[in-house]
């Protein structure tokens, strides 16, 4: 069976047919709008093999989100620096992803734990069409170091299988999206385990899907490479989704091509 390469197919499509656009960082991009890719999580874990993805950073970032944290201190303690460019001198990032996931503020002064609420619906009302978690809190965007790129996601259960669809408003295809795919695939595995479900699909939907002009050489190199089989994910059982540790998450048989470095557009 041929190896599915939806991410690489999108990368090639944007590289070849994308529209030249300016952007906030002043770097310049080529871009397509409204793209979608799908992975069957039962056929392997979608950690890219056409270049090595730093999975340690993926796992720790997701655990950091699930902690409801928004200070880079905890990440730095574990050797992860992917958020440092946007942090204040004290390490703060404002009310970004983790804060919104775990402690969305209400007008009455209360807070909503969206992850716990989503899990409760998966267990008690899996056919609900309201199993959604949003990081896009319009009223708090000015306080965020960076407005959410991956803005909200929805869970869907069919035949005992849990699928997740993410909407990403702004998609740095070369650097950011490989992390996002792996992160939300991992979150889907965790949520499925906690709800007593198998995994279904991870569907990634992108708004502004772009390749930065200073990433074109790296993208071209990546697209020359032959894809390899996806690894398998091994996840320890925990009583709560908030109890997972880095050691609970293991990818097996991951044999990627070497990493490709590229500058981050800040």
Swiss-Prot record:
* UniProt-listed InterPro entries: Thymidate_synth/dCMP_Mease, Thymidate_synth/dCMP_Mease_dom, Thymidate_synth/dCMP_Mease_sf, Thymidylate_synthase, Thymidylate_synthase_AS
MF GO annotations: thymidylate synthase activity
Q: In which pathway does it act?
A: Pyrimidine metabolism; dTTP biosynthesis
- Active-site residues per Swiss-Prot or TrEMBL entry: 149 (nucleophile)
Annotated (6R)-5,10-methylene-5,6,7,8-tetrahydrofolate binding sites? 54, 172, 265
Which cysteines bridge via disulfide bonds?
none
User: What SUPFAM superfamilies has UniProt attached to this entry?
Assistant: Thymidylate synthase/dCMP hydroxymethylase (SSF55831)
Q: What EC designation does it have?
A: 2.1.1.45
UniProtKB keywords: Cytoplasm, Methyltransferase, Nucleotide biosynthesis, Transferase
Q: Which catalytic reaction applies to this protein?
A: dUMP + (6R)-5,10-methylene-5,6,7,8-tetrahydrofolate = 7,8-dihydrofolate + dTMP
A Pfam family of the record is Thymidylat_synt
Compartments where located = Cytoplasm
Gene Ontology BP annotations: dTMP biosynthetic process; dTTP biosynthetic process; methylation
Q: Where does dUMP bind?
A: 24, 129-130, 169-172, 180, 210-212
Provide the Gene Ontology terms for cellular component.
Answer: cytosol
Under the heading PROSITE patterns, the entry gives: THYMIDYLATE_SYNTHASE
Which Gene3D superfamilies does the record associate with it? Thymidylate synthase/dCMP hydroxymethylase domain
Which family, according to the similarity comment?
Belongs to the thymidylate synthase family. Bacterial-type ThyA subfamily.
Subunit info here reads:
Homodimer.
The record, for PANTHER family, names: THYMIDYLATE SYNTHASE, THYMIDYLATE SYNTHASE 1
Q: Which NCBIfam families match?
A: PRK01827.1-3 (NF002497), PRK01827.1-5 (NF002499), thym_sym (TIGR03284)
Provide the function of this protein: Catalyzes the reductive methylation of 2'-deoxyuridine-5'-monophosphate (dUMP) to 2'-deoxythymidine-5'-monophosphate (dTMP) while utilizing 5,10-methylenetetrahydrofolate (mTHF) as the methyl donor and reductant in the reaction, yielding dihydrofolate (DHF) as a by-product. This enzymatic reaction provides an intracellular de novo source of dTMP, an essential precursor for DNA biosynthesis.
Return the protein name: Thymidylate synthase
Q: Which organism is it from?
A: Mycobacterium ulcerans (strain Agy99)
Gene giving rise to this polypeptide: thyA
């Amino acid at each position: 069976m041929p190896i599915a390469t939806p991410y690489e197919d999108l990368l090639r499509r944007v590289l070849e047919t994308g529209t030249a656009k300016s952007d906030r960082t002043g770097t310049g991009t080529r871009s397509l709008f409204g793209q979608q890719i799908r992975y069957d999580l039962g056929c392997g874990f979608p950690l890219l093999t056409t270049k090595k993805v730093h999975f340690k950073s993926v796992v720790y970032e997701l655990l950091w989100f699930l902690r409801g944290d928004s200070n880079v201190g905890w990440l730095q303690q574990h050797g992860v620096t992917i958020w440092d460019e946007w942090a204040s001198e004290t390490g703060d990032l404002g009310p970004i992803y983790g804060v919104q996931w775990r402690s969305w503020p209400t007008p009455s002064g209360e807070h909503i734990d969206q992850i716990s609420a989503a899990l409760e619906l998966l267990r008690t009302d899996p056919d609900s069409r309201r199993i959604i978690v949003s990081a896009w809190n319009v009223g708090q965007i000015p306080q965020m170091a960076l407005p959410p790129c991956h803005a909200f996601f929805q869970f869907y259960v069919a035949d005992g299988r849990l699928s997740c669809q993410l909407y990403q408003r702004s998609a740095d295809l070369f650097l950011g999206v490989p992390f996002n795919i792996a992160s939300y695939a991992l979150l889907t595995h965790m949520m499925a385990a906690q709800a007593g479900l198998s995994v279904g699909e991870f569907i990634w939907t992108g708004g502004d899907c772009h390749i930065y002009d200073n990433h074109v050489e790296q993208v071209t190199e990546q697209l020359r490479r032959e894809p390899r089989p996806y690894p398998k994910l091994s996840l320890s059982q925990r009583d709560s989704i908030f109890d997972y540790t880095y050691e609970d998450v293991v990818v097996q048989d991951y044999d990627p091509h070497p990493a490709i470095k590229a500058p981050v557009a800040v």
